[in-house]
């Protein structure tokens, strides 16, 4: 056996890729892969639980990849909330920094995501329960000083009992970091992100929740723009073209003159726009799909909306114990330096028992 590898690991080809796993994880099976890594499911023999294991794709290929891998590890480590995906374990088969090339993230296994089931009929109580969980997760994330910025149905994992977790913090950034306009899938993207037209904050995620909730209620994507301008046009058809008070908040001159060139129009009546929704659901959507970020609901305000009364438990609407601190966010480090930081994080990691909710809704997805 190679002295550069740890004992207690075994090799297995999964979907034409070599994986090296500790013997505590049994029956690995391919789940999916994307630009930044592949995921397999496995059984943790210590608990009997099914877990998801992510192998990052070439994490040390470049400074950008290495920094991204470090940030993903740190963010997952920071998350301790039942509606946010967090880290159960992290490991590397390497026994020293010199032989360290790959590492694996272990997370709770989730059966599907909202994207895959968006075509199904959602009853209003299912919408209540799922959106309530999205907002609980966001309240927690936002309290840590993090904006998700990429919230869309594919980033919302669900189990058959309607339990939901927010995924994918690869593109999340600290609120006080300069934000760029190319993040959320366009259809779920807040208008202030599309145009970078004004300062924006954590309520970009609330806009995304509004778009997702509307789609769950109607079975159709609310703002299905073909490009940026078409996206904005579709949004303004619903929100109305704003007046002078809003326009003077815009920092971007081109956006200012474009909005001023349009004839002013009122906001649509959301009870007419969503005829199948209850008045409370329409009212919540109206307040989440607010053009002015200063008037849009925060996650905490949205949770207090009467729409969630049947499921609400304020004790479960927890905040992060401390803000997320990524002291290296602005550092320009070499691949080797990022590698050292990641190796140290892995070596120092001690798993924390994750507590999920005491109560269950009794609902089933299908």
From Swiss-Prot:
InterPro entries: Kinase-like_dom_sf, MAP_kinase, MAP_kinase_CS, MAPK13, MAPK_p38-like, Prot_kinase_dom, Protein_kinase_ATP_BS
Cofactor(s) needed by this chain: Mg(2+)
Sequence motif TXY, location on chain: 180-182
Catalytic activity: L-seryl-[protein] + ATP = O-phospho-L-seryl-[protein] + ADP + H(+); L-threonyl-[protein] + ATP = O-phospho-L-threonyl-[protein] + ADP + H(+)
Residues found modified as Phosphotyrosine: 182
Domain notes: The TXY motif contains the threonine and tyrosine residues whose phosphorylation activates the MAP kinases.
Function: Serine/threonine kinase which acts as an essential component of the MAP kinase signal transduction pathway. MAPK13 is one of the four p38 MAPKs which play an important role in the cascades of cellular responses evoked by extracellular stimuli such as pro-inflammatory cytokines or physical stress leading to direct activation of transcription factors such as ELK1 and ATF2. Accordingly, p38 MAPKs phosphorylate a broad range of proteins and it has been estimated that they may have approximately 200 to 300 substrates each. MAPK13 is one of the less studied p38 MAPK isoforms.
Name under which the protein is recorded: Mitogen-activated protein kinase 13
Annotated organism of origin: Mus musculus
UniProt gene name: Mapk13
């Amino acid at each position: 056996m190679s002295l550069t590898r740890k004992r207690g690991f075994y090799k297995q080809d999964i979907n034409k890729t070599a994986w090296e796993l500790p013997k505590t994880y049994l029956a690995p099976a391919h789940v999916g892969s994307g630009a930044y890594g592949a995921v397999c499911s496995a059984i943790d023999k210590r608990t009997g639980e099914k877990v998801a294991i992510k192998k990052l794709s070439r994490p040390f290929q470049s400074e950008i990849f290495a920094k991204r891998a470090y940030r993903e590890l740190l963010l997952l480590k920071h998350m301790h909330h039942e509606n946010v995906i967090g880290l159960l374990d992290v490991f590397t088969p390497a026994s020293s920094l010199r032989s360290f090339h790959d590492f694996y993230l272990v997370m709770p296994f989730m059966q599907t995501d909202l994207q895959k089931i968006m075509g199904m009929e959602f009853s209003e109580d299912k919408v209540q329960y799922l959106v309530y969980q999205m907002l609980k997760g966001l309240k927690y994330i936002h309290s840590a000083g993090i904006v998700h910025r990429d919230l869309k149905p594919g980033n919302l994992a669900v189990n058959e009992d309607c339990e939901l977790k927010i995924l994918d913090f690869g593109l999340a950034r600290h609120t006080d970091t300069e934000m760029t306009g190319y993040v959320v899938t366009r259809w779920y993207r807040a208008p202030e992100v599309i145009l970078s037209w004004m300062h924006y904050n954590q309520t970009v995620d609330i806009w995304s929740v509004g778009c997702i909730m509307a789609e769950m209620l109607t079975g159709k994507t609310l703002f299905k723009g073909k490009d940026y301008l078409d996206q904005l046009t579709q949004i303004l058809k619903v929100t109305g073209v704003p007046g002078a008070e809003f326009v003077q908040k815009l920092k971007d001159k081109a956006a200012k003159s474009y909005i001023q060139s349009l004839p002013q129009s009122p906001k649509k009546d959301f009870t007419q726009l969503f005829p199948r929704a209850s008045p409370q659901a329409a009212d919540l959507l109206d307040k989440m799909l607010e053009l002015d970020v200063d008037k849009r609901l925060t996650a905490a305000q949205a949770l207090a909306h009467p729409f969630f009364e049947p499921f609400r438990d304020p004790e479960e609407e927890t905040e992060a114990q401390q803000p997320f601190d990524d002291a290296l966010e602005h550092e320009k480090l070499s691949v080797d330096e990022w590698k050292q930081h990641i190796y140290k994080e892995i070596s120092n990691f001690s798993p924390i028992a994750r507590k999920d909710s005491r109560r269950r809704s009794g609902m089933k997805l299908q």
